[in-house]
């Protein structure tokens, strides 16, 4: 029987979207488990702040790369750094993504006003970039033992949104968000079957996470949950620890939904 190992000492992790609320929390979790880490995000200023905060709590190696992963040259840059410094990759967390509240013309708006440009951006960022990053990192992950890929999807990758939640708020649910997350969830299954047995691939699908939403939205959203609250970033940490370590050594191709019972109602 394999001994359960809650540590990532000696491991190397990569987190995309690392400057975001969830990405930074995931990064701190992996570092606290003892992993060296590479942080990737398009927002250099925020990424630097995340790195500074992580260095205050850990002596692990922390590398940052500010780039746009929709470009092949940026992906090559990430691969070269990991290859040169570490020679392997144990854990990849794809937390990159456009969310429903992102500020872009033709995005957080009604069905009739959603633009092709915002659609293309969402598919490229949330789905296409993830596939080609994994493809580029495959050899490095194969070199590591028990490597794990964790894709951050959404409950809207499996369930249609209840539009009543968005009534009388400044938040919409763009079609491309749900479509890209659905694609990510099912791409995870395809990758799990294609990369086995060397690499495990799983999805985490959070429900709505409490941030700066209006009281009206929060009340309407919470009414759909069983636990009478929205999620926090910390609610996702347990699943990250489970999937990143050998606690989940026999788990692949799965979608872990963390939504306070939202999708059961």
Residue ranges, per PLM feature:
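Short C-terminal tail/terminal secondary-structure segment
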Residues: 2-5, 80, 161, 220, ...
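Canonical Rossmann dinucleotide-binding motif of NAD(H)/NADP(H)-dependent dehydrogenases/reductases
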Residues: 6-38, 191
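Conserved glycine-rich Rossmann-like NAD(P)H-binding loop of the short-chain dehydrogenase/reductase
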Residues: 33-50
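Conserved NAD(P)H cofactor-binding loop of Rossmann-fold oxidoreductase domains
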Residues: 95-107, 261
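Catalytic Tyr-X3-Lys loop
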Residues: 98, 112-131, 150, 177, ...
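Substrate-binding pocket helix/loop in short-chain dehydrogenase/reductase
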Residues: 103-120, 163, 173, 221
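Short, small/polar-rich loop/turn modules that mediate ligand/substrate recognition or access, typified
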Residues: 146, 196-200, 251-253
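Residue(s) in the substrate-gating loop at a strand-loop-helix junction
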Residues: 154
């Amino acid at each position: 029987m394999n001994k359960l190992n809650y540590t990532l000492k000696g491991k190397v992790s990569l987190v995309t979207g690392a400057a975001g609320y969830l990405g930074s929390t995931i990064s701190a979790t992996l570092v606290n488990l003892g992993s060296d880490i590479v942080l990737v995000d398009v927002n250099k200023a925020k990424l630097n702040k995340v790195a500074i905060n992580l260095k205050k709590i850990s002596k692990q190696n922390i590398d940052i790369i500010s780039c746009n992963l929709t470009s092949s040259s940026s992906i090559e840059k990430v691969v070269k750094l990991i290859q040169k410094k570490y020679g392997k990759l144990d854990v990849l967390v794809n937390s990159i993504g456009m969310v429903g509240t992102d500020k872009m013309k033709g995005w957080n708006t009604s069905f009739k006003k959603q633009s092709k440009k915002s659609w293309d951006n969402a598919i490229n960022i949330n789905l296409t970039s993830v596939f080609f990053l994994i493809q580029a990192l495959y050899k490095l992950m194969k070199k590591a033992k028990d490597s794990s890929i964790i894709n951050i999807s959404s409950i809207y990758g499996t369930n249609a949104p209840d539009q009543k939640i968005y009534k009388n708020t400044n938040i919409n649910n763009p079609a491309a968000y749900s479509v890209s997350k659905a694609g990510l969830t099912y791409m995870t299954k395809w990758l799990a079957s294609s990369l086995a047995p060397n690499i495990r691939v799983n999805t985490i699908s959070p429900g709505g996470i409490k941030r700066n939403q209006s009281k009206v939205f929060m009340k309407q959203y919470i009414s759909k949950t069983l636990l009478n609250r929205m999620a926090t970033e910390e609610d996702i940490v347990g699943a990250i620890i489970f999937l990143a370590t050998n606690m989940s050594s026999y788990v692949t191709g799965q979608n872990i939904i963390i939504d306070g019972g939202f999708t059961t109602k």
